[in-house]
Amino acid sequence: GAATRPRVRRKSARHIMLRATEKELNMILAIDIGNTTVALGGIRDGRVCFVARMDTVRTRTAAEYRAEMDKIFAHRRHPERPMRFEGAVLTSVVPQITGALAECARHYTGKTPVIVSPDIRTGLTMGVDEPRAVGKDRLVDAAYAAANFPLPIVTVDLGTATTFNVVDKDRVFRGGVICPGLSTGLRALGERCAQLPQVHLGSPKKAIGTNTESCMLSGSVLGTAVLIDGMVQRIEEELGSPATLVVTGGLAKYVTPLCRHPLTYDPELLMKGLALLYQLNAPQEHGRRHGGGRHYGQQGRLRAKHPH
């Protein structure tokens, strides 16, 4: 009788709480501010649920970025399960707009974002001359790769610049290599050389080109693959052992099939790295004390979650 009633009530309350939780898409908002684009990722339980991009505009205000982000999130809303950002993590190689996007992150989560810097926990020891000068995206790639692949490891990110990062067997970030990016080099050729056309990216069939376009494609795409193979070989010689190679970046899909060194291609390396750094650095119970986070309802409108 009476003795069983509290037990039934507790069970049903817990059941209701679990069902309410299932109705929300709780995510971490990951923001990667690059030279060309700002990537926004929604990460849930270490899995990347979505990635969207907007142009990097150095003169844009926080309000202008927020208007753009509202559109992106409204487009990705789920009709039954509103998205809720319970925290945010941000990395930037464009200091002029870091503050504006950190403000956006606060708006969507109600909390200060984790901002990537050499001061936060990464699982790495910095073994370079100026740790603060290391590109934050390079740090994110290296931290995730070192935590998830055999050491030593080399990560290569093919973006506006092509960057190599090296972590040795003792988890020391040793530095790396920075080169002009594949598309940057192609664009420069088209702009600086009057007789050279703009070339559409693809994977060249062979090294020897038989027309201007195939020569340029070979030089840029196959040339990048040869650069990766040759540079990793030199790095391995300096480390004194073979290294794991992980390649990422929007242009990697054209290059990785042409590389001869064994590699893993992970287009989501940086987003996964941001999720890892959030886990390592966010305060315990981040966001639960004040009922945190904000929801996107069926109309995609932002609505604050009531703390009670």
Which ranges hold each PLM region?
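ATP-binding/phosphotransfer module of carbohydrate and carboxylate kinases, centering on a glycine-rich
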Residues: 25-30, 188-308
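Short glycine-aspartate micro-motif
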Residues: 28-32, 89, 153-157, 246
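Phosphate/pyrophosphate-binding loops at sites that engage ATP/ADP/AMP, CoA/4′-phosphopantetheine
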Residues: 69-87, 231-243
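Short glycine-rich, Thr/Ser-proximal phosphate-binding strand/loop in the N-terminal lobe
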Residues: 28-71, 81, 172-197, 202-203
